[in-house]
C-alpha cells in the first residue's frame, strides 16, 4: 500500500493534527534507519509501518480517559504501542505519564533516542519485568506482541496492583487463548475487533481474579 494511502487510512481511524503526523514521520524515519542494524521490526512490515504498527498501536487511545494518569507498556520492543500513544498524547495535550519497560539494552537505547528526539513525556526502563522483585502499580497497562495471554494474566495477578485496566492485543489465536484462560481466571473484559485485521482483537480487562 502506498505510504500516502496508509497515512490517510491512519487519519481516518485516528483523527490527529498535522503536528502529530509530522512527529510520527520522524519516528518512522528513526525506526527505518535503526532497523538496518537492530532488527526492530520484521522486514516484511517495513513498508506497512503506518497501518501494521502505528494504526494498530493507536487504536486504544480513545479508551484512555482524562482520569487515567499513567500508562505502562510491558515489553515495549520498538515502541509499540507506547511511543505511538505518547506522540498522540503530546499533541492532544493529555497529561498522561507513559512508561516503557523493555529488557533489551539495544531496544532501550533506541527508545530513549526517539523520546529525546521527539521530546516526549516518557520514562524508559531497561528491566525484565518478570525479574522485578517488587510489585508495580499504574492506572493503565498495555501489551502488544509480548507474551501469550496466560503468561500476561499471571504476571498482572502476581505483580501488579492498583490498576484500572489492561489492554492486550490478541492475534489469530486470541479467541482460543481467551477460552483457555477463562478456565482458570475470572476475567472482566470488553473485546473489540482490531481496526487493522478482522482476525485480531484488543481486549480491555477491568477485573482479574483466580478461580
What would you call each of these model-derived segments?
Residues 97, 121-123, 165, 186-189:
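Conserved beta-strand segments of alpha/beta enzyme cores
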Residues 153-166:
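A short glycine-rich, Lys/Arg-flanked "PGG" loop and its adjoining helix->strand segment in the class I
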Residues 103, 169-173:
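Short strand-turn motif at the edge of the Rossmann-like AdoMet-binding core
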Residues 112, 153-156, 179-181:
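Short amphipathic alpha-helical segments
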Residues 2-67, 72, 106-109, 113-120:
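Class I SAM-dependent transferase core
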Residues 58-139, 143:
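Conserved SAM/SAH cofactor-binding pocket of Class I
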Residues 99, 173-211:
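Active-site capping/gating segments
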Residues 141-143, 165-168:
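Short catalytic-loop micro-motif centered on adjacent basic/acidic residues
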Amino acid at each position: 500500500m502506498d505510504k500516502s494511502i496508509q497515512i490517510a487510512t491512519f487519519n481516518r481511524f485516528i483523527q490527529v493534527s498535522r503536528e502529530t503526523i509530522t512527529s510520527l514521520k520522524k519516528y518512522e524515519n528513526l525506526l527505518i534507519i535503526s532497523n538496518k542494524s537492530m532488527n526492530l521490526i520484521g522486514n516484511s512490515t517495513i513498508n506497512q509501518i503506518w497501518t501494521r504498527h502505528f494504526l494498530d498501536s493507536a487504536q486504544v487511545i480513545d479508551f484512555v480517559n482524562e482520569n487515567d494518569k499513567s500508562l505502562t507498556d510491558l515489553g515495549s520492543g520498538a515502541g509499540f504501542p507506547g511511543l505511538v500513544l505518547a506522540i498522540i498524547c503530546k499533541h492532544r495535550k493529555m497529561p498522561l505519564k507513559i512508561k516503557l519497560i523493555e529488557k533489551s539494552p539495544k531496544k532501550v537505547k533506541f527508545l530513549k533516542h526517539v523520546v529525546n528526539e521527539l521530546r516526549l513525556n516518557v520514562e524508559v526502563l531497561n528491566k525484565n519485568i518478570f525479574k522485578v522483585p517488587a510489585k508495580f502499580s499504574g492506572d493503565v497497562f498495555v501489551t502488544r506482541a509480548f507474551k501469550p495471554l496466560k503468561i500476561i494474566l499471571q504476571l498482572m495477578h502476581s505483580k501488579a496492583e492498583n490498576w484500572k485496566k489492561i489492554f492486550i492485543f490478541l492475534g489469530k489465536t486470541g479467541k482460543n487463548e481467551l477460552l483457555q484462560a477463562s478456565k482458570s481466571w475470572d476475567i472482566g473484559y470488553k473485546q473489540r475487533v482490531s481496526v487493522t485485521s478482522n482476525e485480531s482483537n484488543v481486549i480491555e480487562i477491568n477485573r482479574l481474579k483466580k478461580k
